[in-house]
Structures are given as structure tokens and as C-alpha cells.
Amino acid sequence: MGIQLIVFLGNPGAEYEETRHNAAWLLLTYLFPSIVLPWRCGCRGSIARIEGFEGSSEEVWLLKPLTYMNRSGKSVGAACAFLQTDAKQLLVVHDELELPFGVVSLKQGGGLGGHNGLRSIKEVLGTADFWRLRIGIGRPPSESVNIAQYVLSAFYPAEMAAFPKLGRATRDLLCQLVVTDQAATVTLLSAWRKKRLLSLCE
């Protein structure tokens, strides 16, 4: 079995909707444009089940923690317990400072890169050995810009306009992760280690 639970990290509230820290939530908006996701409240967040994911026979759950970023682990831990999901069946989609906008990176385990949402998940699960899909948001334009303020700043209009294409380009990877068994994932890790999906110059 591949990925069973996909978590999209972000902050609830209208003031955070288009901020860089909410890149995963913005991506989710454009991942499944042709279906209405059956969201319901649960596991300290919004959770939805998709049967026959992207035409496969697999079932996958989607989770948007509503605990705010720094407490994401409380929601993820509750969902993993409810679904009996282990770390190897968990994919966390999150913003990544070290990648430029338009670049995504698939990773399993490893360091947390100072990301408070990932840190919270590790603290609750007791392991960092879960999958991550890192969505590039780029670094601040100047070293004088505070990182905390930067990740809570809004995307530029050109970046916002690119999210539909970013969502379409990412959907294929998510489908492969859901239907691919653990033994075959090394190929995906290699292909998606650092992949540019779009350029704002296009």
C-alpha cells in the first residue's frame, strides 16, 4: 500500500489565505478541480475521503489541520490514530523556503528545515520518517527581511496566478504515491527530488 493520508499544512483564517505559509492549502485548491471534496470536521481539522483515487482502486484521506501551523501535530496525530496510519503511509505537503517558487521536492524523513509545522508533527508522532512534498516559496528578497514576517506575507499576483498550473502538475505525483507500493518509491524519490514544474517567465 502507498500513501494513505495526505496532510496539507496551513493556517486557518481569511488573513492567511494567500500567504506563503499557506502554499499547501493554495495548492490543494487546484489539485482536484473537477470534483467536490467531501470535507467534514474531524481530527482537529477538515478531513475528506476519496474512494477510487484518480481512477485507481485505492482510497486516500486528505487533511487540513485547523490548529494553526505550530500545533499541526495534534491534528495529524489524531488522524493517524483514527486511520491506523503509520509514518510511511503519511505525506505532508508544506511550504519550503529553500526552494524557489515553481519547484517542488519529494523527500522521505530527514531534517525539518526549521519548519514549525513539521516539528510539531515529529513531536507528536515520535518520528520524522514521513513523506514530505516541499512546495517552493523562495527566500526573502533581502537578508534584512524577517523570516517569520516573510512566510506570513502574501504571494505576488503572478505567483497566485500560477497555482492552477502548479496544482495540475503536482496531481500526477500524488496519484503515483497513492498507488505505488513502498518498494517502488525509490524511482519517484529520484524523479521528484527537485523538480521545476513551472517558471514565472513562461
Swiss-Prot record:
Subcellular location: Cytoplasm
Location of the active site: H21
Entry EC number(s): 3.1.1.29
Keyword Protein biosynthesis appears in the UniProt entry: no
Reaction catalysed by this enzyme: an N-acyl-L-alpha-aminoacyl-tRNA + H2O = an N-acyl-L-amino acid + a tRNA + H(+)
Catalytic class of the enzyme: hydrolase
Keywords attached to this entry: Cytoplasm, Hydrolase, RNA-binding, tRNA-binding
One CC-aspect GO term: cytoplasm
Function: Hydrolyzes ribosome-free peptidyl-tRNAs (with 1 or more amino acids incorporated), which drop off the ribosome during protein synthesis, or as a result of ribosome stalling. Catalyzes the release of premature peptidyl moieties from peptidyl-tRNA molecules trapped in stalled 50S ribosomal subunits, and thus maintains levels of free tRNAs and 50S ribosomes.
Subunit structure: Monomer.
Similarity field: Belongs to the PTH family.
Protein name stated in the entry: Peptidyl-tRNA hydrolase
Underlying gene: pth
